[in-house]
């Protein structure tokens, strides 16, 4: 069935494309109609886009397009096909997705290829438009940027951005259509481009990557595209730009080419703009519509921000794998250890007799902590997984290991999910006289969190201060071989170019808060750091799960890999909670394996209050239980 669709991405008056565009709804059993159109019209490039179900990440709609025709395909009817017809459909789809005479073109082509391979069990060959014209830095182009460069400067960039974060069927179709328009404008570049080819990887690797990327898509679908901003003031600077003074770091207006900033007055007057710069608590906004007269009462950000450095590094790794630029997914022993393990003989654990004499800090640890330190120092345990309940001395155990590495001049990087987690490790290392440096992003530090680092300011390096001058970087590091940062900082391209990995190679990687980190975040890092030979993961899977676990239940932390459970270490003594409370937690949460050492032993330190009549009430972005609050006040007054 044919109809028409009108696009609003490229102004019609430019005469670049035909209006309206023919739209054909095609069932998965009629893929041959697309093949016929490609053959009959000698189509050189076919744009492609897809939509995934927010429930389970399966592909429900695929759009194929030329500059004049869009074919909307529903894949949801595949399961209803009889055997022979399903085979025929698969054959047609395979010929379409692997056609060497007609280039499939898409933004994030690696993702598209993995999703189609997983859903349809067919191999895909295509071209990634986002990196087709990348410069020397390899930064990918957004659809709006590439349309501006290759189609016309007057394209509607904000509408193009919106088409890529919205998932209405029309948006899916227009994404495929614009991909085709851009591809058709550069036939020579398509012919010489590196191809994304699923045949570059074995099926087991493709399935693994497809499953991991499905989790990512589910998480991205949950991200808000409308965020309210808390602000202190809005002023006009000498260049005519608005300056927002943000009140909260968590919802600050960030510099972005892909989002729109909406400022509203009490009378409904609206100003729209783009956040073009950010410094500390202030964000500069270039006004695109409306006049500023003061009295701003509400600020919101519409759209989806650019990927982080870590997200770009992850996606770039997957793209290079499928293009054949990386020889194998499993060239890192740590990728093999996590996702493709081979049977390993159980490592014997020595007693460490005599070590206490030459390591006083080790002598002060309990036996479970000593066992972990010995494993971290051992050459025959490349992966050390440590389950540490609260108050069991995880950070202290890490510090003792680092103290020895620091004494021997052996480099180690210590990372955590959050800046606060990294800072807490730094405080412990100071007590152990470990020489270290801590790298913090300018965005997090300046004006927002400088007070957190006052006691370690001389050890702090701002990431933006690491310049590509080997002498200056060496001066800043100052001989330190222990480096602290967040897991995302390891993907910052500034660290790659400044030479810090030459001065302090990533040979040992210690991860705190590992139970809150999706293991997929490490895959590209394992491949990146070829000298890595020791990985130590600390966390507590009984506490906070990684963000998004409810949305993507198949997400795994290191503690979800069953083959590590028999050899994982357990820190079995807690020192933080009074003994009665510790024993209760041990019995209810840790299978009675957690011992308690504390000066408070009396049962009166614990009170249980029945609040079965309580109910959660929504308060802003959080929840409260009024009955609990009343109970807390009552108990406090006893």
What are these regions (language model features)?
Residues 144-204:
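Acidic, Mg2+-coordinating catalytic module of metal-dependent nucleases/exonucleases
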Residues 1-45, 198:
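N-terminal accessory regions of nucleic-acid-interacting proteins
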Residues 390-392, 397-430, 437-440, 569-574, ...:
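Conserved RecA-like ASCE P-loop NTPase motor core of nucleic-acid helicases/translocases
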Residues 418, 488-490, 503-638:
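Conserved helicase motor core of SF1/SF2 NTP-dependent helicases
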């Amino acid at each position: 069935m044919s109809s028409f669709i009108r696009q609003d991405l490229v102004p019609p008056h430019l005469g670049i494309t035909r209006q309206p565009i023919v739209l054909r709804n095609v069932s998965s059993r009629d893929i041959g109609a697309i093949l016929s159109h490609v053959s009959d019209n000698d189509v050189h490039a076919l744009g492609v886009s897809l939509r995934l179900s927010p429930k389970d990440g399966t592909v429900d709609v695929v759009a194929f397009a030329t500059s004049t025709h869009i074919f909307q395909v529903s894949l949801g009817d595949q399961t209803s096909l009889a055997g022979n017809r399903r085979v025929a459909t698969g054959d047609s789809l395979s010929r379409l997705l692997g056609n060497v005479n007609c280039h499939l073109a898409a933004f994030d082509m690696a993702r598209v290829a993995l999703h189609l391979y997983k859903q349809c069990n067919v191999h895909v060959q295509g071209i990634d438009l986002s990196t087709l014209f990348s410069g020397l830095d390899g930064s990918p182009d957004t659809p709006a940027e590439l349309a501006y460069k290759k189609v016309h400067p007057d394209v509607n960039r904000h509408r193009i951005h919106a088409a890529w974060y919205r998932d209405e069927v029309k948006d899916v179709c227009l994404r495929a259509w614009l991909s085709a328009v851009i591809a058709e404008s550069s036939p020579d570049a398509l012919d010489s481009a590196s191809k994304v080819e699923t045949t570059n990887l074995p099926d087991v690797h493709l399935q693994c990557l497809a499953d991991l990327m499905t989790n990512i898509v589910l998480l991205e679908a949950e991200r808000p595209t409308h965020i309210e901003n808390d602000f202190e003031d809005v002023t006009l600077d000498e260049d005519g730009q608005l300056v927002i003074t943000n009140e909260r770091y968590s919802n600050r207006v960030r510099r972005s080419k892909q989002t729109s900033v909406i400022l509203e007055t009490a009378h409904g007057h609206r100003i729209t703009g783009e956040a073009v710069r950010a410094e500390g608590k202030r964000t500069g906004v270039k006004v695109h519509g409306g006049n500023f007269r003061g009295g701003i009462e509400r600020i919101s950000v519409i759209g989806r921000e650019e990927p982080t450095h870590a997200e770009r590094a992850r996606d770039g790794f997957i793209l290079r794998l499928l293009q054949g630029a990386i020889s194998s997914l499993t060239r890192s022993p740590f990728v093999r250890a996590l996702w493709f393990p081979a049977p390993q003989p159980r490592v014997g654990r020595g007693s460490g007799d005599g070590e206490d004499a030459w390591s006083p800090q080790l002598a002060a640890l309990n036996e479970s902590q000593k066992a972990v330190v010995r494993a971290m120092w051992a050459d025959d345990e490349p992966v050390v997984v440590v389950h540490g309940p609260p108050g069991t001395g995880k950070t202290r155990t890490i510090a003792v290991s680092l103290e020895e590495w620091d004494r021997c001049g052996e480099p180690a990087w210590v990372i955590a999910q959050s800046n606060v987690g990294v800072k807490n490790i730094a405080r412990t290392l100071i007590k152990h006289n470990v020489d270290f440096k801590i790298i913090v992003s300018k965005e997090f530090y300046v004006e927002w969190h400088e007070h957190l680092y006052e006691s370690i300011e001389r050890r702090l390096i701002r990431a933006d201060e690491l310049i590509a001058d080997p002498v200056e970087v060496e001066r800043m590091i100052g001989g330190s071989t222990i480096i602290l940062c967040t897991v995302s900082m390891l993907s910052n391209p500034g660290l790659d170019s400044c030479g810090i990995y030459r001065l302090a190679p990533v040979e040992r990687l210690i991860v705190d808060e590992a139970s809150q980190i999706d293991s997929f975040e490490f895959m590209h890092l394992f491949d990146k750091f070829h000298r890595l030979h020791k990985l130590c993961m600390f966390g507590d899977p009984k506490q906070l799960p990684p963000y998004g676990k409810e949305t993507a239940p198949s997400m795994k932390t290191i503690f979800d890999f069953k083959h590590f459970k028999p050899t994982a270490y357990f820190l079995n003594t807690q020192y933080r909670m009074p003994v009665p409370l510790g024993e209760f937690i041990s019995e209810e949460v840790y299978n009675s394996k957690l011992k308690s050492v504390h000066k408070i032993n009396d049962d009166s330190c614990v009170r249980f209050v029945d609040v079965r009549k309580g109910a959660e009430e929504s308060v802003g972005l959080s929840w409260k239980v009024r009955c609990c609050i009343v109970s807390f006040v009552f108990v406090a007054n006893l």
